[in-house]
């Protein structure tokens, strides 16, 4: 079923690197073409994914986020093995990695399809626009100086509010258990296409989180004399200036995970994971 498989690992986690070697050896023994590389090598990964039919990650949610950005716009399914902490997106424990891979190779499992956002960063000056895919969240926030910034929000080209706050988060359903949740946002069912808008420590005005329909377009406009930053999925980070706009909408692209657990896995594990219990269900 799978003729070419890529293994993407967390390069700073020795256990993730060692497991990647064992998985590659298993695929070699089965005569399946495979390649391995670091999740931190986006350019190299992009050059290797041609004709790859399955991606296996060894790491945590951060490894998955980097992998997703590297393989897009290709919608290659991901089988994820948790060597991180909470692991909301991961599927297997390290102990079950080989057996789980064998099950997937035998045709078992189902596809868990996740919605993405796409963002266009529009500088206020003549600098070129930039485009991003977003799996978890986009954050416009203050810089290192502890001063609030103003972020004006338009929804579908209509003014909504101006946050005077530490910043604002626009999140997918997948990202709803991350920074948005920590800032007081709701948790969405992971396959939802809705979009979450959440202010970060607002000083005055609207302090609530808002769930927007999937067809919404959201503009965040920076208005500050102080340092401000844009963070995409927690690892693409850049300074932004007053007058810059981040325009976000739902993407037509998806990220697909291979699951071996029943389709109610999210609800069964949600409370445990949000309480900070990092133990995998496969370790119990």
UniProtKB/Swiss-Prot annotation:
It is an enzyme of class 2 (transferase). Its main location: cytoplasm. It holds the Pfam family NAD_kinase. One of its GO terms (molecular function) is ATP binding. One of its GO terms (cellular component) is cytoplasm. It comes from the Bacteria. It is found in: Cytoplasm. Its EC number is 2.7.1.23. InterPro entries: ATP-NAD_kinase_N, ATP-NAD_kinase_PpnK-typ_C, NAD/diacylglycerol_kinase_sf, NADK. SUPFAM superfamilies: NAD kinase/diacylglycerol kinase-like. Its cofactor is a divalent metal cation. NAD(+) binds at residues 61-62, 66, 136-137, 147, 164, 166, 201. The active site is at 61 (proton acceptor). GO terms for biological process: NAD metabolic process; NADP biosynthetic process. Keywords: ATP-binding, Cytoplasm, Kinase, NAD, NADP, Nucleotide-binding, Transferase. It catalyses: NAD(+) + ATP = ADP + NADP(+) + H(+). Involved in the regulation of the intracellular balance of NAD and NADP, and is a key enzyme in the biosynthesis of NADP. Catalyzes specifically the phosphorylation on 2'-hydroxyl of the adenosine moiety of NAD to yield NADP. Belongs to the NAD kinase family. This is NAD kinase. It comes from Dehalococcoides mccartyi (strain ATCC BAA-2266 / KCTC 15142 / 195). The lineage of its organism: Bacteria, Bacillati, Chloroflexota, Dehalococcoidia, Dehalococcoidales.
């Amino acid at each position: 079923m799978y003729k070419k498989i890529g293994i993407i690992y967390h390069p700073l986690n020795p256990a993730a690197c060692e497991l990647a070697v064992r998985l590659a050896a298993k695929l070699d023994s089965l005569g399946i073409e495979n390649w391995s590389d670091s999740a931190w090598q986006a350019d190299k990964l992009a050059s290797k994914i041609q004709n790859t039919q399955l991606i296996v990650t060894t790491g945590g949610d951060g490894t998955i986020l980097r992998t997703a950005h590297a393989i897009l716009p290709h919608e290659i399914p991901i089988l994820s093995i948790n060597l991180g902490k909470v692991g909301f997106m991961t599927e297997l424990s390290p102990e079950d990695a080989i057996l789980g891979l064998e099950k997937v190779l035998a045709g078992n499992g189902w596809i868990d399809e996740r919605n993405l956002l796409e963002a266009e960063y529009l500088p206020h000056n003549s600098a070129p626009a930039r485009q991003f895919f977003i799996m978890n969240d986009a954050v416009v926030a203050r810089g290192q100086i502890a001063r609030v910034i103003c972020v004006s929000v338009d929804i579908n080209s209509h003014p909504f509010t101006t946050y005077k706050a530490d910043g604002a988060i626009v999140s997918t359903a997948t990202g709803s258990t991350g920074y948005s949740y920590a800032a007081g946002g709701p948790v969405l069912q992971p396959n939802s296409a809705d979009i979450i808008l959440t202010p970060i420590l607002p000083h005055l005005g609207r302090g609530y989180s808002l769930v927007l329909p999937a067809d919404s377009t959201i503009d965040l406009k920076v208005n500050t004399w102080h340092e401000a930053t844009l963070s995409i999925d927690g690892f693409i980070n850049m300074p932004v200036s007053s007058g810059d706009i981040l325009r976000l909408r739902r993407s037509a692209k998806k990220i697909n995970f291979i699951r071996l657990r029943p389709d109610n896995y999210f609800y069964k594990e949600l409370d445990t994971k949000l309480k900070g219990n990092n133990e995998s269900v496969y370790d119990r």
